[in-house]
Amino acid sequence: WTRADIQRRASAALARAAANGVTHLRSHVDWFTADAPDAWQEIARLDTVGITLERVALVPLPLFREPAQAETIARAVANSGERCLLGGFIHSSNWDAAAMENLLCSAARWDLDLDLHIDEELSEVSQGLTWLADHLSRHPFPGHICCSHGCALAAGSDEQAAPILRQLAAHGVTLIALPMTNLLLQDATFGRTPRQRGITLLHEAQAAGVATLLGCDNVQDAFCPAGSYDPLDTLACGLFSAQLSDLFDQQSRLICDRAALTGSPADAAPFAVGATASVVIFPGSDRFIWPLNSAARLVVNHGRLTHRRVWQEEMAHES
């Protein structure tokens, strides 16, 4: 991809997200070496159209194997400005406990929050979350940690998952499920219908006190040719794939809990008297059918109406 191509694609993505009512978006940027890729700088130059945009350096775990290189990567992220996080792609195919140790230590030294792409597999022997839970019990992390995917939790037993979830809750770790991507890619074999859903343990995590969110990890890329930048699509997918209930009153937090994403107490109360409002109004919906049949909307960002999507008329014709 060229820089111009990155600009075009990313700008279109931000415009679509803003029109859907997104005000805070976090993007994983693939790093293939210890040096920042072109996309890292190009995304920083984007007009974010009123969206708070965070960049995560998604680095394959083996690149943290050498402590000096781990420091180089963490320093580069820390020197990239505000709203940058250190991340890692952690899978049984690249597992390295020493690299995990270096990843967490370098993030702590450079005062970076972590966003870990971890255990995206249906393997009972994946070690990412198991190792992290054990490590945190002995070495608390000073910043905030998000763990996305965590599909492997659904492949093991409840007895295996329970102590992991207790440790994640105790250390304020947020667990993010990606229902569209997980349904598409997990238990996938060409010509065979999948048997497993591949969604992490949302209900069990919530019961254990773990902060939970839903996200959309891939939109029209090499891993997922479809998708959208509409959080309501993600929530609707989660409704069916994870059998969620109380969508409007309770589980709507899965797509709008900024504090769960950032770990910042300042984000815990987005509505305050005198503050500028950032809300999405669904004029053709109600709490019983939402998030389905809710495409029409009014987007108010920081007190200003920025987008309006309405149905002018719905016609019924007799045959």
Which residue stretches match the model-derived regions?
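Alpha-helical scaffold segments that flank or form the walls of functional sites
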Residues: 1-28, 34-48, 72-78
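Generic structural signal for well-ordered alpha-helices
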Residues: 10, 14, 40-44, 71-74, ...
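Divalent metal-coordination and catalytic microenvironments
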Residues: 21, 86, 117, 147, ...
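Short acidic/polar active-site loop segments enriched in Thr and Asp
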Residues: 23-24, 84, 211
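Alpha-helix-loop-beta-strand connector modules within alpha/beta enzyme cores
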Residues: 37-55, 111-116, 205
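Active-site core of metal-dependent hydrolases
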Residues: 54, 58-67, 78-197
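His/Asp/Glu-enriched, well-ordered alpha-helical/loop segment
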Residues: 134-144, 196-282
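C-terminal cap of metal-dependent C-N hydrolases
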Residues: 253-255, 271-319
